[in-house]
Amino acid sequence: MRTQWPSPAKLNLFLYITGQRADGYHTLQTLFQFLDYGDTISIELRDDGDIRLLTPVEGVEHEDNLIVRAARLLMKTAADSGRLPTGSGANISIDKRLPMGGGLGGGSSNAATVLVALNHLWQCGLSMDELAEMGLTLGADVPVFVRGHAAFAEGVGEILTPVDPPEKWYLVAHPGVSIPTPVIFKDPELPRNTPKRSIETLLKCEFSNDCEVIARKRFREVDAVLSWLLEYAPSRLTGTGACVFAEFDTESEARQVLEQAPEWLNGFVAKGANLSPLHRAML
């Protein structure tokens, strides 16, 4: 029997870089919100203990794929604690809609969906805390997808406080370039000393993203899309890019702007969601 699981996108409604640790990782303050749009992961259980990804990603080795790594990590963790039923395995496939290097959290979301779904399907019984801790070893954004609620994040993104920002409508646009996260974080001109503020203060301020100035300067495609969107609505970069988003109060407003978009602008309209579509599917 094949089951399907949402793997939603996220937006960083704001992102501030507050410092850099000795190990090179950047400390930040950011606000995560999910979208009711994303990839779909299909899982069919096996009884021979094997993990197979039926939809490989070009240029990514099978065992290096975050989906496979997440499944193997859950398998090992559950087995080590005697909570993995004998023969547990899975065939996994993905209907990929989220771009790589887009700042929408696609890979992290995929890993989280696999952890949550297989924990349920294999009946391992691991807690959300355990799954989030495992997820952090796969990527800094994985825990927020595992926990499934919009959150204010600090540290390197692993210290999460659930929040409920307004669930607006967004026009999300992809400039047609992929921006690897290290390209932004290694840039010498990236602001790295934004003062820390309380979540209460930040929620009252105008939102912005410290990475945006670098993305616009280094990638003219990002600058072009943002310049166009800003004519219509408050707009900014998500994560380290490359995707940007404009926010609206209604779906019709967002769709009207998308209909006017030039041919070179690829985008979609989605609603913000404080409860992840993955967790909504589990209810």
Swiss-Prot record:
Active site (catalytic residues): K10, D141
Pathway, per record: Isoprenoid biosynthesis; isopentenyl diphosphate biosynthesis via DXP pathway; isopentenyl diphosphate from 1-deoxy-D-xylulose 5-phosphate: step 3/6
Enzyme nomenclature, EC number: 2.7.1.148
Superkingdom of the source species: Bacteria
BP GO annotations: isopentenyl diphosphate biosynthetic process, methylerythritol 4-phosphate pathway; terpenoid biosynthetic process
GO molecular function: 4-(cytidine 5'-diphospho)-2-C-methyl-D-erythritol kinase activity; ATP binding
Classification via SUPFAM superfamilies: GHMP Kinase, C-terminal domain, Ribosomal protein S5 domain 2-like
Cysteines engaged in disulfide bonds, as pairs: none
Enzyme class: transferase
Catalysed reactions, as listed in the record: 4-CDP-2-C-methyl-D-erythritol + ATP = 4-CDP-2-C-methyl-D-erythritol 2-phosphate + ADP + H(+)
Presence of keyword Nucleotide-binding: yes
Protein residues bound to ATP: P99, M100, G101, G102, G103, L104, G105, G106, G107, S108, S109
This protein's UniProt keywords: ATP-binding, Isoprene biosynthesis, Kinase, Nucleotide-binding, Transferase
InterPro entries: GHMP_kinase_C_dom, GHMP_kinase_C_sf, GHMP_kinase_N_dom, IspE, Ribosomal_Su5_D2-typ_SF, Ribsml_uS5_D2-typ_fold_subgr
Reported function: Catalyzes the phosphorylation of the position 2 hydroxy group of 4-diphosphocytidyl-2C-methyl-D-erythritol. Phosphorylates isopentenyl phosphate at low rates. Also acts on isopentenol, and, much less efficiently, dimethylallyl alcohol. Dimethylallyl monophosphate does not serve as a substrate.
Xref: NCBIfam families: ispE
Family: Belongs to the GHMP kinase family. IspE subfamily.
Subunit structure and binding partners: Homodimer.
Listed name of the protein: 4-diphosphocytidyl-2-C-methyl-D-erythritol kinase
Organism expressing this protein natively: Escherichia coli (strain K12)
